[in-house]
A protein has these predicted regions:
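Divalent metal-dependent hydrolysis catalytic cores, especially in the metallo-beta-lactamase
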Residues: 88-114, 127-137, 181-194, 224, ...
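Active-site microenvironment of metallo-dependent hydrolases
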Residues: 1-21, 26-27, 36, 90-97, ...
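His/Asp/Glu-enriched, well-ordered alpha-helical/loop segment
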Residues: 220, 290-293, 302-388
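Metal-associated gating/positioning segment near the N- to mid-region
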Residues: 54-125, 141-145, 209, 241
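Histidine-centered divalent metal-coordination motifs
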Residues: 52-54, 64-68, 219, 228, ...
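Active-site mouth loops of central-metabolism enzymes
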Residues: 74-87, 148-171, 203, 224-226
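Active-site metal-binding motif and surrounding structural segment of the metallo-beta-lactamase
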Residues: 37-57, 80-83, 177
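Active-site core of metal-dependent hydrolases
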Residues: 188-303, 320, 325-327, 346-348, ...
Length: 439
């Protein structure tokens, strides 16, 4: 048994905070998390760590992950050699874990990298978050997954699987299942920035029949389905087909909101606004002018997203943290910016943003409820922070403030600065926290 004593505790519920607390865990699971007064008696041989006032919270869940994206531009995602992608993906996984994200739901992978990354993490060869592995995006001809014009004949297919018709869709899902994928990603509508004649938001890439076949085949094979859906039409098609994770949902009409509310016990929505926000900061570097359709379009999209998230929160729909990190303007390692966006743009309190990243993310990752909060019986995933995110959510963006990360009872430090060894025992963590006390 390991006991973290003398800590400030946030257990994953938005309204919970305990300033004089302890957490006890063994065999990768929580035994107790709460006030020091009333904590269980220690077993012989229990290892006690003095937390020196550090803030302890559940490990976070990145719910829109692209670990195999290598900080390229949005139209360059499949241009790197697969060998280079693998090397960078291993680095990205370590950075994500070191940033306090102990779990990740993939929203798409280049090539088959995610599935092999998951195997490497599970067998201990790679340091990274537990992963629901994604595969190549499934899209129709002319969709946001169909990046290359016919005349180019580039023979590059590392990002998308282009399918038309129910049987092509079904075969693509079966191929992903064969490759070890957990989450099938489908492009339901388009993007304001698309190569060539790619479809835009609001234009559906698949018929109702095609999408129903995709979801049905995925669920039949034990996989879940994530989608890119910006428009109300795309959200409605996704919910009706049974999609599990909806990415973006920027524009909602009354019917789309009603469908989401009716299915709020099974469906999760992640607005993933990092792209829009950073594009509006850097659009000129992409060659766009102020007032261009793309600039005005993303500004309107961000404003619409704020209204949509407000309505979803009022309807009790779980809104998740995760934001298309892995692009050149949203690089790996900046994942915690998303919590800041939740407070700045969506009106979340810091506690509500933390709950979205922990409790609700855990419910999305593991529907059985075993992940995302620090309560007896739950998986022992924790982040030890020098500072109080409930007072200043931005502290989670400071690499120096992440004192340690605990994933399923294993303690890690130094993942962001290449210190070695990364894994620590209780005595080493006790020494580390004592060297940088918070009280």
């Amino acid at each position: 048994m390991i006991v973290l004593n003398n800590i400030a505790l946030f257990n994953g519920h938005a309204d919970h905070f305990c300033g004089d607390a302890c957490v006890a865990f063994t065999d990768g699971h929580i035994i107790y998390a709460g006030p020091r007064e009333g904590s269980p008696s220690l077993d012989d041989g229990a290892q006690v760590i003095d937390g020196h006032g550090h803030f302890v919270m559940p490990g976070m869940v990145e719910s829109h992950a692209h670990l195999s994206y290598t900080n390229n531009g949005p139209l360059e995602l499949d241009k790197s050699p697969v060998e280079e992608v693998v090397i960078k993906t291993i680095h990205n996984a370590r950075v994500m874990l070191g940033s306090g994200f102990t779990s990740a739901i993939s929203f798409g992978s280049v090539h088959r990298v995610d599935a092999f990354l998951k195997r490497g993490i599970e067998c201990g060869d790679v340091l990274g978050p537990r992963l629901l592995a994604g595969g190549r995006d499934i899209g129709s001809t002319g969709s946001n997954a169909d990046l290359h014009p016919d005349y180019a004949q580039l023979k590059i297919d590392g990002l998308g699987m282009i399918t038309d018709g129910p049987w092509e869709v079904r075969k693509a899902v079966r191929t992903l299942s064969k490759n070890g994928v957990d989450v099938v990603k489908v492009m339901i509508d388009g993007e304001l920035i698309s190569s060539g004649g790619g479809i835009k938001p609001g234009v559906l890439g698949f018929t109702d029949e095609e999408l129903a076949v995709l979801v049905g085949e995925a669920h039949h094979r034990g996989m879940r389905v994530a989608c890119h859906a910006r428009s109300a039409a795309a959200v409605k098609q996704a919910v009706k087909a049974g999609v599990d994770f909806i990415g973006h949902a920027n524009y909602l009409d009354d019917e789309a909101l009603a469908l989401l509310e009716e299915n709020r016990d099974r469906v999760f929505v992640g607005p993933a606004v990092a792209w829009e926000i950073t594009f509006l900061e850097h659009y000129q570097s992409f060659g766009f002018e102020t007032g261009s359709p793309e600039h005005e379009g993303y500004a309107a999209e961000l404003e619409a997203t704020q209204a949509s998230v407000k309505r979803m929160r009022e309807a009790g729909i779980r809104v998740l943290v995760g934001g298309d990190y892995g692009l050149n303007i949203t690089p790996h390692g900046t994942y915690a910016k998303e919590l800041q966006y939740f407070t700045d743009y969506f009106g979340f309190s810091p506690g509500e943003a933390l709950q979205a990243a922990t409790k609700h993310g855990g419910e999305a990752f593991m529907p059985d409820g075993s992940l995302g909060t620090l309560e007896a019986g739950k998986i022992a995933d924790m982040v030890i922070v020098k500072g109080n995110p409930l007072e200043q959510i931005g502290v989670l963006q400071d690499a120096d403030a992440i004192a340690a990360v605990i994933k399923e009872g294993q303690i890690y430090t130094g993942l962001l600065d290449n210190q070695s060894p990364h894994q620590k025992n209780a005595e080493q963590l006790n020494q580390l926290l004592g060297a940088r006390p918070c009280n």
